């Protein structure tokens, strides 16, 4: 088949760690698609000429890895919308669902409406707003639309009004968006990956182990995800298989599948949650989890399900083509 890969070239001298991974992912996907016998064409969504070429190309399926256009995260939904306008099947969920999930507040409201337990939260437009009395410290602060753990660091967990004001101010000014302030749920953290298909497959549950970290650092921040030489990265350990009872595994897996269905997703996704007092609290639904060939939690889950990287790429491609029939 003629396969198009929509991607970001990040054509600058110094790329950020997550940008290097995104670019490496698009190259790895192309390598494995060629291994499967497909013809691969790359389209840089930051390049107007490539966008024109995409509109004129005879592409049968697009493997969409684009996460932004000119550093604007809304470009993620724009790219999917363009592919839909061109009637090209693509590996991502729909542009509407992408746009819905980009804003964490909208996503939380939709989950709460459907009786999914989430951490209580409040949105701060500026640091002078009053904290709601129902939100006790400690609290967790992040941007309403930041992806890839951008804006999350060791100071994101706040324990008093002064720390809260400082973090809200940072999100408001540095990232030019409201701050999402939510109660910090203690307990264990799990990620549940979902492989799309005629019957969506719940992949083996992954636990993020923080036991080697002090209590005030037991969460995934930017360093833990991207800075491989950092202490946070080295001491944040993914665990397979998880030490859970059959009933606990069922509860966590069913919660993840409910979230997948609530959002009407039909492509690969991951649901992150905290498990405390025998209760799962959904933190986030990642409609575009990393599928980098090395180090990706989603890829590890596929491997634990019995799929190697090439087989995973083939499954995602086939799902995109079949959805369009």
Feature map (PLM): residue ranges:
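A short beta-strand motif that forms the metal-chelation/ATP-contact edge
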Residues: 3, 61-63, 191-196, 279-293
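Short beta-strand-to-turn element immediately C-terminal to the catalytic PLP-Schiff-base lysine
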Residues: 124, 155-160, 194-197, 276, ...
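Phosphate-binding site of ATP-dependent enzymes
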Residues: 161-248, 254, 281
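ATP-dependent carboxylate activation and anion-phosphoryl transfer catalytic cores
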Residues: 112-115, 243-325
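Hydrophobic beta-strand scaffold residues
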Residues: 40, 89-90, 118, 139, ...
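A short glycine-rich, hydrophobically flanked beta-strand micro-motif that places a catalytic Asp/Glu
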Residues: 45, 179-183, 190-191, 264-278
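Active-site nucleotide/adenylate-binding loops and adjacent lid/helix of ATP-dependent enzymes
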Residues: 1-7, 55-58, 99-180, 185-188, ...
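ATP-binding N-terminal substructure of ATP-dependent carboxylate-amine bond-forming enzymes
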Residues: 1-90, 96, 125-131, 324-325
């Amino acid at each position: 088949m003629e396969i198009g890969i929509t991607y970001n070239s990040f054509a600058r001298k110094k790329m950020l760690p997550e940008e290097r991974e995104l670019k490496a992912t698009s190259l790895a996907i192309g390598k494995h698609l060629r291994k499967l016998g497909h013809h691969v064409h790359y389209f840089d969504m930051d390049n107007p000429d490539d966008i024109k070429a995409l509109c004129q190309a005879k592409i049968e399926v697009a493997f969409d890895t684009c996460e932004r256009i000119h550093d604007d995260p809304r470009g993620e939904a724009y790219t999917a919308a363009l592919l839909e306008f061109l009637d090209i099947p693509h590996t991502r969920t729909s542009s509407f669902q992408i746009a819905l999930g980009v804003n964490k507040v909208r996503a939380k409201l939709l989950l709460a409406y459907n009786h999914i337990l989430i951490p209580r939260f409040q949105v701060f437009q500026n640091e002078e707003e009053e904290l709601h009395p129902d939100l006790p410290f400690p609290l967790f602060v992040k941007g309403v639309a930041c992806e890839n753990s951008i804006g999350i660091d060791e100071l994101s967990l706040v324990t008093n009004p002064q720390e809260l004001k400082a973090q809200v101010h940072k999100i408001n000014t540095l990232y030019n968006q409201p701050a999402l302030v939510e109660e910090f749920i203690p307990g264990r953290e799990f990620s549940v990956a979902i492989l799309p298909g005629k019957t969506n497959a719940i992949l083996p549950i992954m636990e993020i182990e923080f036991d080697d970290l002090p209590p005030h650092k037991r969460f995934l921040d930017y360093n833990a995800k991207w800075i491989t030489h950092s202490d946070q990265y080295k001491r944040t350990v993914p665990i397979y298989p998880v030490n859970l009872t059959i009933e606990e595994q069922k509860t966590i897996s069913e919660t993840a599948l409910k979230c997948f269905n609530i959002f009407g997703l039909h492509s690969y996704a991951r649901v992150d949650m905290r498990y405390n007092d025998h209760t799962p609290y959904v933190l986030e639904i990642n409609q575009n989890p990393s599928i980098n060939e090395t180090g990706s939690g989603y890829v590890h889950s596929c491997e634990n399900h019995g799929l190697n990287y090439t087989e995973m790429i083939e499954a995602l491609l086939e799902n995109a083509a079949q959805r369009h029939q």
